[in-house]
Amino acid sequence: MQNNVSLRLAKRIWEVVEKEFESGELFEKVSPITKELLRFWFCEPFISQRQFNFHKGQKQSILNIIYLHEVLKINNVLEIYEQVAPDLLLESDLFGAKETRNSLKESRYDLPKYLVKMATGTGKTWVMHALLIWQILNAKNEEEKSGRFTKNFLIVAPGLIV
């Protein structure tokens, strides 16, 4: 059931993000740098001028993470559930229904964590590149440092496959 709940959470996030992206509302909630990047990555005339573009799964991953981090300002795993799909906390059997909320308050969950579930060969590295660029450019151009963006990264990749 845990995987089912996680996938349903991802679907709920995407439903909100896709609606806001298509309506243009998302562009008003992000920084000017993010707005420019999103237009360059996902909008006309740019996408028709390039030979290669992000595919739907990559776009979904990038937009979801940007939405959670920059728009909702998520600080931990529990906040994702509380802000996007509180009803899924009750259905989750991560630790037993009653314990899930308290367990997600533990210090090991007390930082932003984003998971991108993509199969081998579907472009996870391109998603990571985009997210690193998004973080670096926003960190470099923030007038007041918010702590939401960074120029420092540690990427741990087992073997040859990320």
Regions found by a protein language model. Give the residues of each.
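Charged, low-complexity intrinsically disordered regions
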Residues: M1-K29
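The conserved Walker
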Residues: T120
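Conserved Walker A/P-loop ATP-binding site and its immediately adjacent core
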Residues: W126-V127, S146-V162
